[in-house]
Amino acid sequence: MGVILFAFHASLFTSCGHKEPNHYTHEVLNRMTPIKDQGDSPTCWIYAMLAAIETEHLAWGDSVNLSPYYIEKMMEREPNLPEDKRGMGATLLRLIQKYGIVGYNAMRSIETPVPKYAFMAGAEYTTQEFARSVCKPDEYIALTANDEEPYYQEVDIVLPDNWLNDRFYNVPIDTLLKKTERAVRQHHGVCWEDEEHAMAIVGIAHDDGGHRYFIMKNSWGTDGPYGGLEYISYKNFRRNTVAVEMTKEAYGLP
């Protein structure tokens, strides 16, 4: 997933044929780290998946704020990295297991020298040790809803963004929406992706007409009308979702 064009942004974040409501009532708004700004980098998928991991930990009472620049720099070692640096949430999960991760304050820009160690609560970790403490191997499940593939088994997503050839557990879109809503209401972190963009789902809201929306934490800074948040209707979730990542616990697996 990469930088989304404004025209597509306008069509996605409004209901088809209707003016976007000006007022939303929040039903759930989960804890999150400060809104970041990806700038011109097409790495929304890194920001979105890290934001989901951060929200997951904040729900446990942990304070975790992770550096997207570390992954953006380390993935340059990947032989199959696309020139445009696009990817998916599942890609990020693979990369942090391989290269590790550091806190945001340890690497606040792409120009910062890559740290060899991560520090938390006065303790020193290798970057891989730190990554395993914030995202255990196989902790997350990658989901999709493709009605042209068999349900309840892993399938391929054939997109250039899926350059690590990750496989996704395929469920009906109604099931995916219900599982996502339940995860958010239980304060889990969730990463959402369509073909052009990725964001973290941090809450649920409804408009004055009673229509429900997922509250998204975007990665375009805080200058927008909602301070860096976006509102995606359930209708657009059904229409546009390519993939969702959440913990297996959030999905309901042991």
Protein language model regions, located:
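Active-site signature of cysteine proteases
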Residues: 33, 121-254
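C-terminal motif of bacterial Sec signal peptides marking the signal peptidase cleavage site
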Residues: 13-15
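Bacterial signal peptide processing site
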Residues: 17-19
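Active-site nucleophilic cysteine motif
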Residues: 38-53, 82-94, 197
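Papain-like cysteine protease catalytic cores
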Residues: 64-134
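Structured segments of extracytoplasmic/periplasmic soluble domains
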Residues: 47, 51-60, 95-102, 183
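Bacterial N-terminal signal peptides
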Residues: 2-11
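An N-terminal structural lobe/cap that precedes and organizes the functional/catalytic core
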Residues: 28-38, 63-66
